[in-house]
Amino acid sequence: MKTRPSVKPICERCKVIKRRGKVMVICSNPKHKQKQG
């Protein structure tokens, strides 16, 4: 899980979702997981 100021989808399987007011990227590739914070 990477925490960065701006989250962007890296590949076509990345999904941008909002959880508890935080923007997150979830993907089948665990390296692509990101959260904003």
Curated annotation (Swiss-Prot):
One of its GO terms (biological process) is translation. SUPFAM superfamilies: Ribosomal protein L36 (SSF57840). It holds the Pfam family Ribosomal_L36. It comes from the Bacteria. PROSITE patterns: RIBOSOMAL_L36. InterPro entries: Ribosomal_bL36, Ribosomal_bL36_sp. The keyword Ribosomal protein applies. Disulfide bonds: none annotated. Keywords: Ribonucleoprotein, Ribosomal protein. One of its GO terms (cellular component) is ribonucleoprotein complex. The keyword Ribonucleoprotein applies. GO terms for molecular function: structural constituent of ribosome. Belongs to the bacterial ribosomal protein bL36 family. This is Large ribosomal subunit protein bL36. It comes from Natranaerobius thermophilus (strain ATCC BAA-1301 / DSM 18059 / JW/NM-WN-LF). The gene is rpmJ.
